[in-house]
Amino acid sequence: MNKIVYLKEIDKSLYLNKITLKIQYWFKRVFNIIKKVKIENVEIWNLPINSDYNVKKIQKVFAKLLNSENVYVLSQNLENKKIYNVLNDKEIKYLKMEKIKKLLSIKILEYILSIQKREIQNTEVNILVRESSNINSYIIEEIAKNALNVKIISNNIYKFKKIEEKLYDEYGIAIQFSNSYKKSLSKSNIIINLDFDEIDLNEYLIYDRAIIINCINQNIKIKSKLFNGVVINSVNISFNQELKDKFKNLGLYNDFSCLVLLASVLEQENYKTDINNYLVKIKNLYGNNGQISKNELKLYLTKK
């Protein structure tokens, strides 16, 4: 079973006001206790770690605790270069957000359409995808079964013949394929990016008021000066009280975003897991310039 190691950084400002608190801080830093617990299907090691740890100390911690191929590291902030670099140098697997973002893409789409008071059944969805992985194929199938039309933009069209045949044979659904850099996305209102990187995406002529739901781990930005649409790089969610209470009891709820916490729970579950089991709701969407307002989404979706 995969294990999730939660790296919690100690806020030393809470300890350094008085000499006695300094002693408490250093004692806690040296004699941290690993709390090993289970939540859902995930085993958790609650490991406090300082943001000012030097590289050697981080390596020592990882060497002792992560001597297993089945361990995934999850930090409060993987933009912490020290932690991120050590993870890569030591080839230690860390939890990425791509799986959860893909699973949420349909819910994000429904959230956007609900703001506009439109139905997914009346919407054409364009999907950027390179690989026919299980989860990518699953997302394509689920969207195709609900949307008015689905167009797949890929330079590996041959990889999607099986999903094309399945959708047509079992559901009578025909999907479109395209890889024209000038035409594929030039009139596309809704684009879901499953696995294109920023460089590849910017090779295409993109409709200047498109809404792009980005599912890859890195933020993307459209380089065209004509582009005045929306790129959704992140999302704020909520989930049911039961799961919330479990994370509160572990002391994790206030230290990690709900998106990250849900991702850790779903890591061991089948990609077909219904996230509605956790009563997941979209609260806010975020782009390159911060939170995206509902009025902004409404504007971009209606004008063409």
Label each PLM-derived region with a short phrase.
Residues 115-182:
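Glycine-rich phosphate/diphosphate-binding loop of Rossmann-like nucleotide-binding domains
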